[in-house]
Amino acid sequence: MSTTTESTHDGAGETLVVAGGQDWDKVVEAARSADPGERIVVNMGPQHPSTHGVLRLILEIEGETVTEARCGIGYLHTGIEKNLEYRYWTQGVTFVTRMDYLSPFFNETAYCLGVEKLLGITDQIPERVNVIRVMMMELNRISSHLVALATGGMELGAMTPMFVGFRGREIVLTLFESITGLRMNSAYIRPGGVAQDLPPNAKTEIAQALDQLRQPLREMGDLLNENAIWKARTQDIGYLDLTGCMALGITGPILRATGLPHDLRKSEPYCGYENYEFDVITADTCDAYGRYMIRVKEMWESIKIVEQCLDKLQPGPIMVENGKIAWPADLKVGPDGLGNSPEHIAKIMGGSMEALIHHFKLVTEGIRVPPGQVYTAVESPRGELGVHMVSDGGTRPYRVHYRDPSFTNLQSVAAMCEGGMVADLITAVASIDPVMGGVDR
């Protein structure tokens, strides 16, 4: 739009007029007081490449400016929390691991910590189990952050970080497959311990994987940290300060990007995190770039923690030594492929009838958990992942509710995006890093 300037006769200064001869200030005022009917409503998603799955964003826009932004969720609802009420306590792990599918080990650990707290066996968990849990969670944190940075880069037009991120994630998933048998949703963490011990060569494989991960992490930083285009698209975008985070219950990298060093691994340690040396990464920018830098640096801290896990990993049991809670932890996979070695079967069948009955009841009915309710929480890659668990004294949960950080953090979309541009909304949502499996459950 071409403009000209005219001097006013009263000497007050200059008046900016548009090509049509109108005063520019009057044009702006007219636009601001325009009929809301001139604004349009646009649905971004649920089928859209930039909404992280089946997230629907209902946008009211005026030109390129977002005047109102609302989230539409529920397109990935699976009824997992309700299904848990019809499954044994141990079977529940198979369901919860599928909620936030990018960080399944955190779902499993939070659930198992709650069951163990109800059982009163938190202090009886073997040291080896806690080390394995911490190690798997930190490896999972790396893989989850790599996906966040890879997809975030792709959505802003940076394709190379996507390839770098997924190449690094493949290293971690291959390691998970070697240890648990599955790349994702492994149901490896169990109430009282873990499903099986590490393979004989696991320490060597993990050390090699850490060495291989350093290259893609360095490459990701080299590509984006000082990239002028990346900084222009992320700095001062998706702004949310500490007051906003506190009002909305926001946690994770979004909260730490305001300068508050809130991390449950430090403030309320679990699984022995108090025995590990690592830093809580913060920033003071309150924007998408600060959240990006936090995730990059947190991956390096996770590598430090996993290295300490390898040093702490000592031989020992991988399940609590309580026959009323856990199956025997030293089973070997027999010819039937079900973990019943001939020696174990002979011991069960050749022992007392009571032992056989107990084993049968444990397998078919599951453990009984004393009545009560607990809340446990872990620091997932997206923030505080909490579990409110209620038991009525039976073999199944009465109620299990997950406080998923993706669900809570999505509340910040309106605060981050209203008043900004449509293109910047993509940046803001990518910096939140929501996983719809955890949002809808």
Swiss-Prot record:
Catalyzed reactions per annotation: a quinone + NADH + 5 H(+)(in) = a quinol + NAD(+) + 4 H(+)(out)
Keyword Cell membrane attributed: yes
Record EC number: 7.1.1.-
Gene3D superfamilies: Cytochrome-c3 Hydrogenase, chain B
Topology versus the membrane: Peripheral membrane protein
One Pfam family cited in the UniProt record for this chain: Complex1_49kDa
GO cellular component: plasma membrane
Protein location: Cell membrane
Keyword NAD belongs to the record: yes
GO MF, any single term: NAD binding
Class of the enzyme per the UniProt entry, highest EC level: translocase
Entry keywords, A to Z: Cell membrane, Membrane, NAD, Quinone, Translocase, Transport
InterPro entries to which the protein is assigned, alphabetical: NADH_Q_OxRdtase_suD, NADH_UbQ_OxRdtase_49kDa_CS, NDH1_su_D/H, NiFe-Hase_large
Subunit text: NDH-1 is composed of 14 different subunits. Subunits NuoB, C, D, E, F, and G constitute the peripheral sector of the complex.
Family, per entry: Belongs to the complex I 49 kDa subunit family.
Role this protein plays: NDH-1 shuttles electrons from NADH, via FMN and iron-sulfur (Fe-S) centers, to quinones in the respiratory chain. The immediate electron acceptor for the enzyme in this species is believed to be a menaquinone. Couples the redox reaction to proton translocation (for every two electrons transferred, four hydrogen ions are translocated across the cytoplasmic membrane), and thus conserves the redox energy in a proton gradient.
Protein name, as recorded: NADH-quinone oxidoreductase subunit D
